[in-house]
Amino acid sequence: MALDTEKIIADLKEASILELNDLVKAIEEEFGVSAAASVAVAGAAGADGAAEKDSFDVELTDAGSAKVKVIKAVKDITGLGLKDAKGLVDGAPSVIKEGVAKDEAEELKAKLEEVGAKVTLK
């Protein structure tokens, strides 16, 4: 069975939003996957978009006055070498870890703030 990509795309262009929504749900059920990225993008436009978010990026916004401690914490969190960890800290704002669960993101934020860094979760 060969797929005709152009025919599939043409059929998708002609489908209504409701039909496309049903298709996405059927694909999610059939293959056990989630279209969470598209939901997160759509939800971000609404006021409750942050409440539905399930993965976060931990961003170092400022190293503060205890830069050496922050570099060590970044090194421990990321598993990077000392030079690379220093580069992340010196290049703030920089993302320390991407796509982590909310509880892990809050734990990492607490560790970094404990040594004097300023951190945001995105």
UniProtKB/Swiss-Prot annotation:
One of its GO terms (molecular function) is mRNA binding. InterPro entries: Ribosomal_bL12, Ribosomal_bL12_C, Ribosomal_bL12_C/ClpS-like, Ribosomal_bL12_oligo, Ribosomal_bL12_oligo_N_sf. One of its GO terms (biological process) is translation. It comes from the Bacteria. Disulfide bonds: none annotated. Keywords: Ribonucleoprotein, Ribosomal protein. SUPFAM superfamilies: ClpS-like, Ribosomal protein L7/12, oligomerisation (N-terminal) domain. The keyword Phosphoprotein does not apply. Pfam families: Ribosomal_L12 (PF00542), Ribosomal_L12_N (PF16320). GO terms for cellular component: cytosolic large ribosomal subunit. Gene3D superfamilies: 3.30.1390.10, Single helix bin. Homodimer. Part of the ribosomal stalk of the 50S ribosomal subunit. Forms a multimeric L10(L12)X complex, where L10 forms an elongated spine to which 2 to 4 L12 dimers bind in a sequential fashion. Binds GTP-bound translation factors. NCBIfam families: L12. Forms part of the ribosomal stalk which helps the ribosome interact with GTP-bound translation factors. Is thus essential for accurate translation. Belongs to the bacterial ribosomal protein bL12 family. This is Large ribosomal subunit protein bL12. It comes from Ligilactobacillus salivarius (strain UCC118) (Lactobacillus salivarius). The gene is rplL.
